[in-house]
Each structure stands twice: as structure tokens, then as C-alpha cells.
Regions:
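Beta-rich ligand-recognition domains in immune and ubiquitin systems
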Residues: 1-168
Length: 168
């Protein structure tokens, strides 16, 4: 997996090799380029079948999330959530660990923030699962979803000074 800089929110800096993303104060108006309000970036490779997984190293502070998003989220012009803009993710926000979709937040209590997260996608089963990669322990699995034949992209959100996500 590599990050697609053309999908990066203006407040995010993607490394030249496409392996990491970090937060930086905006040099331009984020709404001017048709980006949503979320400081996120997508992976270059779209997934339409099979199983795949990737690991990321995350910072223990700040706010970040990792997961997958439908192709329709790739270039959205509006900031409101609709069923066409689905995502399945997990992350840290204000010290609380969450499982997040476009429509809901599920608090994950008694979870120690992992150093590395493994995202696992089974396209045919519609399954997205997250693991503590160091402990090889399951953190959360979303109920089966239908991806409706659309491409699914790795999705990364970084939201605060000092937050960074690096692909392993």
C-alpha cells in the first residue's frame, strides 16, 4: 500500500515515497480544493476482490484513524455524510479509542493504544478487522458489509500536531 498524495487533505503532508503522512497547519483554505472537512488521504490501490492486509505504525498521541473507504469517498465535494460515502475505520481521538463508520462511533474501552495496527479486508465477505500487530490480537471487527462492486481504498486520517501514520 502506498498513499495517493492527490487525495490528501491540504493539512496533510505525504512523504515522497508515499509511506507516511503527518499533520501540518494548512497553507491554503482546505475548502478551496473540494476536500471534505476530514484531514484524510487514501491509498493508491483500489481493491475490488480478494483479501488483503497492511500494517501501520501510529503515534500514541494526537488523533488518527485507519481503515477503508469506498471509491465514492475519493473526491467528495460536500462535507455532509451520506450512505454513498461509507468508511470503516478505527482510531484514537482525544485519548479515546473508537471504531468509526460514516454514520456511527463505537467506543472501544479498555484498549491499550497499539504501536502498530494491522488492517485486514476480506472483500467478498465484506469484512474489515483491526489487530494489534505486535500482540497479534484482534481489536475490532465490523459486521459484514456489502461493498456493492465498488473499489475500496485504504483510508488514513491524521488530525493534530504530532500525529503521524507510517506504513510498515
Amino acid at each position: 500500500v502506498t498513499l495517493d498524495p492527490s487525495t490528501a487533505h491540504p493539512q496533510l503532508v505525504v512523504s515522497a515515497d508515499g509511506r507516511s503522512v503527518r499533520w501540518e497547519e494548512a497553507q491554503q483554505d482546505p475548502s478551496a480544493k473540494g476536500f471534505g472537512t476530514d484531514p484524510c488521504v487514501l491509498g493508491c490501490q483500489g481493491i475490488t476482490s480478494g483479501r488483503c492486509c497492511w500494517e501501520v505504525e501510529v503515534t500514541p498521541k494526537g488523533s488518527w484513524a485507519v481503515g477503508v473507504a469506498r471509491e465514492s469517498l475519493k473526491r467528495r465535494e460536500e462535507t455532509t455524510v451520506s450512505p454513498e460515502m461509507e468508511l470503516w475505520s478505527m482510531g484514537l481521538c482525544d485519548g479515546q479509542f473508537w471504531a468509526l463508520t460514516s454514520l456511527e462511533r463505537i467506543p472501544l474501552y479498555q484498549i491499550q493504544v497499539p504501536r502498530r495496527v494491522r488492517v485486514s479486508l476480506d472483500y467478498e465477505k465484506g469484512q474489515v478487522a483491526f489487530f494489534d500487530a505486535d500482540k497479534r490480537a484482534l481489536i475490532f471487527t465490523f459486521p459484514a458489509a456489502s461493498f456493492k462492486g465498488q473499489q475500496i481504498h485504504p483510508w488514513f486520517l491524521v488530525w493534530s500536531e504530532g500525529s503521524q501514520i507510517t506504513l510498515c
